Amino acid sequence: MDQVDKKILFNLLRDGRISQRQIAQNVGISAQTLGYRINRLISDGIIKGYSLIVSPLLDGQVEGFAAFKSDRQYNGGVSFITRCLEEITLYGFRGDRMEDVEEKIAAAGRELGDPVMKYFPPTAQVEMNLNSNDMEIIRLMRGDPRMPVTDIAAKLDLPYMTVKRRLNLLLKNRLIGVVSQIDLSGGDVVIYSIFSHAVDAVTKLLEPQTIFAIRDSTAGVLFCYSENLKGARESISRVRSVDSDADVMVLYEYQFFT
C-alpha cells in the first residue's frame, strides 16, 4: 500500500461513483495503471464493494444518531454502524416519527448503556419533484451503485441526458449517495468522525479531508479521511482550536444497511 493507492482510496471514499478516468486524472497516473491498481485492491480485499445510501426522506422517515461506549454488538434495526478505536460505536436509526427513533435509541441503550452522544437532524423537505423514472433509477442502483448512466438509460429505455440530469439531481439533493466499502485496517488509512456545535468553522477547516457530513446550521457529524495518524492528529488539533468540546472518534470499521 503506497501513497498512490491511498490517493485512489480517498477519491473513491469522497465519491463512490467517480469514474476511473477522473481518478486517473486526479492521481496523475494512466488509465491502464489505475485499472491494475484497482483490480489489485479488490483482489486483496481492500475495496470490498459499494453501497447505495437512500435518504429516509424518500420513505417519509426521519433519522437520528447515537454513540455508545460499549464493545458489544447491536444490530437492532440500525441504518449504519461505525466502530471506533475508543470502544465507541456510532449508530444510525430511522423511523416514521421522531418518537420511533428515540424508542430505537432507548432500546439500544438498554443493551449498550446510556448513549454518550445523540444527534437529531431537523426534519427537511425533499427539494426536487420526484417522478417514476427517479424511483426506477434508484431501484437499479440498489443492485449496482456504480452502474454507468449509459447502462441505466438502456435498461429504462430513456434518453441518456434525461437519466444523467435526474441522477445528478438525486445526488445534488442528497437523496441518494454511493459509499465505497473499504477495509480500513488492510488499507492502512484513517477515517475519523467529528461531532461539533461549531459546525461552520469545523466544516471549513476539514473540507479537503471530508468524505461526507450530516449537519444542520447548529451542529453536525463530519466523516473525514487521512493518509496516516499523524495527519489525522494535526487535523483534530485544528478542530480543537475552534471547538474544544468537539467529540472525535477514529473509525476502524463501518457498515451501511440502507
Model-identified regions with their sequence ranges:
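A compositional/biophysical signature of low hydrophobicity enriched in polar/charged and small residues
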Residues: M1-T258
